[in-house]
Amino acid sequence: MILISHRGNIDGPNTDKENKPSYISNAIERGYNCEVDFWYVNDKFILGHDKPQYEIPFEFITTYYNKLWIHCKNYDALTKLIEIDRGGVYFNYFWHDSDDVALTSKGNMWANPGCYIPNSIAVLPELKNDKLTDRLGVCSDYIINYE
């Protein structure tokens, strides 16, 4: 099962550190994949949940490309990644609004809380006590609990 840290969180939410590059790096160095909230604004790559917060060099994404699940937070972020990596050859990215499930550029199903689909990524299953049977992976603020 793929274990994905939600915004860098490992043992619970930490809104002061979520999406901070050093926090993301720490989760990856501990062996987890990581979901990040990604913006593209004024030709800059930026991480942040509700708003762009942490500008990052493109090399941050290329360094961790095989461990990142990139949640595009604005249309420009999505179109920039499509331009750079059409078809998700390198990067695993997706966009959604209020959908139950999103399809990533690598063909993975990103299933939001309460949506059970076999072979999908269960996102924050602790919120709805979601079943993990037959899942490809889990994305959680408490990812350490799924080891």
Residue ranges of model-derived segments:
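Phosphate-group recognition and catalysis centered on beta-loop-alpha active-site segments
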Residues: M1-E147
